[in-house]
Amino acid sequence: MANYFNTLNLRQQLAQLGKCRFMGRDEFADGASYLQGKKVVIVGCGAQGLNQGLNMRDSGLDISYALRKEAIAEKRASWRKATENGFKVGTYEELIPQADLVVNLTPDKQHSDVVRSVQPLMKDGAALGYSHGFNIVEVGEQIRKDITVVMVAPKCPGTEVREEYKRGFGVPTLIAVHPENDPQGEGMAIAKAWAAATGGHRAGVLESSFVAEVKSDLMGEQTILCGMLQAGSLLCFDKLVAEGTDPAYAEKLIQFGWETITEALKQGGITLMMDRLSNPAKLRAYALSEQLKEIMAPLFQKHMDDIISGEFSSGMMADWANDDKKLLTWREETGKTAFETAPQYEGKIGEQEYFDKGVLMIAMVKAGVELAFETMVDSGIIEESAYYESLHELPLIANTIARKRLYEMNVVISDTAEYGNYLFSYACVPLLKPFMAELQPGDLGSAIPEGAVDNAQLRDVNDAIRSHAIEQVGKKLRGYMTDMKRIAVAG
């Protein structure tokens, strides 16, 4: 099969990369009604599979789970989760033929096998759903022409999808219809109903394309979301310990520092994160971030180029065929790093201490977020998509590190994200070592002393931070979420 994106001409590629429209709340006035009375069969009962299914059932839809015969016979975790939550469970042969919508929520590397197994069983005119378009765009899976192919992609882990729904809200979501598979013109109606059933319409929905979702998702997770956090954790820990910091304290400062720093990012973007610093520290963080952007720009661009060309996907799929040899080797090596094996610190670190002693970490976050955003936009991806795949998801990934360090992050993210993370971090760590050697006292592990600052310089830095395109679009999108949450809670 050919990479679908590479079969398109340049005009088609640009059109699909640039497809992004923030949908109005009024477009979801019918809620999930288009799918009510129809049979929805979910394949896979992992975090997305289970939690989307719970939300959809609570929204009045008929949900069941199709699992492989072995999973049922051996009562594996997927079978236990589905049955313990009161769902009907059956084999592909038992459930797929009656399904109006089959939702494939298995891991990326299983998609081809799953789709080839379920396609012959699907009735004429049924629909096939994804929450990530890798199988369609990168693998180039060919779907029967009578089948409608749609995507609903929540921009959060599955657990968050459920928790926000239970709070009466939802998570921002991308929806799309595959242009090669919409024979009855009902793809958008199906996608909107599915998104509404998960609660996504309450937080904001972007009408996108399979291509834009895949290319931006891969770029975000490889660079700022996972790769930068992993590289930053390893570099910062080693630097602190080399300069005499207690390894346990250094580990805690980094493990929980990312989460604390990005919580400010979540509430008010890069502007608020930088405002948590003293004026001298803000000026230093800004200067460090500009240096980092200059050093790392070629690496970010290489990752984007390899994603656009399909080079990344072909390399990863070759590793799939080789029993994940590279992935498993990198995973094992990460588990043996000094950061992962450091002792736990029993003392308390105050919230402001993470900011005051983490100026370099803040600079890394700023540089990584802006670079990922800029590189995506320069490649034809619309700003709203680039925002969701960079700044918006970063606090969620930082939270996984706060739970069990890099191990937890790499367990929670997909194998696709994990593979890309290692590619980036293995290149980024040696790239930044000369930069790390030139750091000054106060950049990491100790606070920058208060002192006089140049008013004009501070004014210009504040203007530069606030005027960046990601701050402009971020303020708009966070405003939409706040407004929609207010409406949802009131209604």
Swiss-Prot record:
Which residues are noted in the entry as substrate-binding? S414
What the record says about the induction of its expression is: In the presence of acetohydroxybutyrate and acetolactate.
**BP GO terms, sorted:** isoleucine biosynthetic process; L-valine biosynthetic process
- Locate the residues binding NADP(+): C45, G46, A47, Q48, R68, R76, S78, D108, K109, Q110, G158
* A GO MF label: magnesium ion binding
SUPFAM superfamilies per UniProt: 6-phosphogluconate dehydrogenase C-terminal domain-like, NAD(P)-binding Rossmann-fold domains
Q: Where does Mg(2+) 1 bind?
A: D217, E221
According to its UniProt record, which cofactors does this protein need? Mg(2+)
Provide the KARI C-terminal knotted domain boundaries. Answer: 209-344, 345-484
Could you list this entry's UniProt keywords, alphabetically sorted: Amino-acid biosynthesis, Branched-chain amino acid biosynthesis, Magnesium, Metal-binding, NADP, Oxidoreductase, Repeat
Every copy of the KARI N-terminal Rossmann domain together lies at 15-208
Catalyses:
(2R)-2,3-dihydroxy-3-methylbutanoate + NADP(+) = (2S)-2-acetolactate + NADPH + H(+); (2R,3R)-2,3-dihydroxy-3-methylpentanoate + NADP(+) = (S)-2-ethyl-2-hydroxy-3-oxobutanoate + NADPH + H(+)
Q: Record's InterPro entries?
A: 6-PGluconate_DH-like_C_sf, 6PGD_dom2, KARI, KARI_C, KARI_N, NAD(P)-bd_dom_sf
Q: How does changing the pH alter activity?
A: Optimum pH is 7.5.
* Biological role: Involved in the biosynthesis of branched-chain amino acids (BCAA). Catalyzes an alkyl-migration followed by a ketol-acid reduction of (S)-2-acetolactate (S2AL) to yield (R)-2,3-dihydroxy-isovalerate. In the isomerase reaction, S2AL is rearranged via a Mg-dependent methyl migration to produce 3-hydroxy-3-methyl-2-ketobutyrate (HMKB). In the reductase reaction, this 2-ketoacid undergoes a metal-dependent reduction by NADPH to yield (R)-2,3-dihydroxy-isovalerate.
In the record, the note on similarity to other proteins reads: Belongs to the ketol-acid reductoisomerase family.
Q: What is this protein called?
A: Ketol-acid reductoisomerase (NADP(+))
Q: Which organism is it from?
A: Salmonella typhimurium (strain LT2 / SGSC1412 / ATCC 700720)
